[in-house]
Design a protein with these regions (language model features):
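N-terminal alpha-helical targeting/anchoring segments
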Residues: 33-89
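Acidic low-complexity segments
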Residues: 2-14, 21-35, 78-166, 201-228
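Short linear motifs in intrinsically disordered
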Residues: 16, 42-50, 163-168
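Ordered hydrophobic segments in well-structured contexts
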Residues: 24-28, 56, 66, 174
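Charged, low-complexity surface segments at secondary-structure and domain boundaries
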Residues: 1-4, 64-69, 108-121, 183-194
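Short, compositionally biased leader-like segments
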Residues: 2-33, 239-267
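Active-site-adjacent "lid" and substrate-binding segments of diverse enzymatic cores
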Residues: 139-267
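Short, compositionally biased low-complexity segments
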Residues: 56-61, 96-111, 174-188
Length: 267
């Protein structure tokens, strides 16, 4: 457990003096700090840094009400009072319980091997990774790639009148690639885990599926079928030529080898 989030300290203090009729209160914060860089071909595009914090405040009397806000400078006591007022419009017949011990904690933050400080990178490191990844994708795709690479720190915290005070934080990296009508996405907990392979595999599959239909002239052809195509043919044949036996309660199996099963086309 880390120190109480700065955004929740005022709510922790306000919970010592709840408004009249308020029996319990809770405040939860979700903060995202995002650093991103964009590559367009071999050129570095725009870079950006942003931060957003959302607050969810609940208060209970006979019933429970909530307030959602991004106004971090709002008076905590007033927000709790507003949540209590909102409880009057609740359709519930009784108050909802506030979080108890072990309410939540990110799995990554629980992992003894996870060290967020070691996963954070500088803007230069992020830029170099974006340049390398974009170059690898362009070489494979054979066309210009637009790549956005971002580092996001997600911090979540909660305080309430059950003496719950929890904070957890995790860093995630995400890459978004666009090229020739293709759009792909991948994410990882460390920058080193982001590789071009998932994009290349997805790009190849989509290009194959987008191939135009070609009408073939009547004749005899030799063709190589994928395992999925073979399975689809076999399943279709099974459904077409064994349904009669299946409906009658007899075995749907064909019987002896080379014995006809309802069709002169299949033996």
């Amino acid at each position: 457990m880390k120190e109480c989030m700065r955004e929740l300290k005022a709510y922790k203090a306000a919970m010592q003096f709840l408004p009249s009729g308020c029996l319990a209160a809770e405040a939860e914060a979700e903060k995202q700090e995002k650093l991103s860089v964009e590559m367009i071909g071999s050129q570095t595009g725009p870079m950006s840094c942003s931060e957003q914090t959302e607050l969810f405040v609940r208060a209970s009397g006979q019933k429970t009400g909530m307030v959602y806000t991004q106004k971090l400078d709002a008076n905590a006591s007033d927000v709790i009072a507003q949540a209590l007022t909102n409880s009057e419009d609740s359709a519930a017949k009784k108050a909802e319980p506030m979080a108890a011990a072990d309410y939540w904690e990110m799995d990554e933050a629980k992992d003894s091997n996870y060290d967020q400080a070691k996963t954070l990178v500088s803007i230069e490191t992020l830029k170099n990774k974006a340049k390398t990844l974009a170059g690898q994708l362009e070489e494979s795709f054979g066309c210009q790639v637009r790549l956005n690479l971002s580092q996001t720190i997600l911090t979540m915290g909660i305080v309430n009148t059950n003496n719950i005070e929890e904070t957890a934080s995790v860093c995630r990296f995400a890459a978004e690639a666009a090229a020739d009508g293709y759009e792909g996405y991948a994410c990882a907990l460390t920058l080193d885990e982001l590789s071009p392979e998932p994009f290349i595999h997805d790009f190849s599959n989509r290009r194959f599926l987008d191939m135009p239909t070609i009408l073939a002239e009547p004749g005899v052809y030799r063709a190589v079928l994928s395992s999925q195509a073979v399975n689809n043919i076999l399943i279709t044949a099974w459904q077409m030529f064994t349904a009669k036996r299946a409906r009658s309660g007899a075995t749907p199996l064909a019987g002896k080898e080379n014995k006809k099963i309802f069709s002169d086309c299949i033996t």
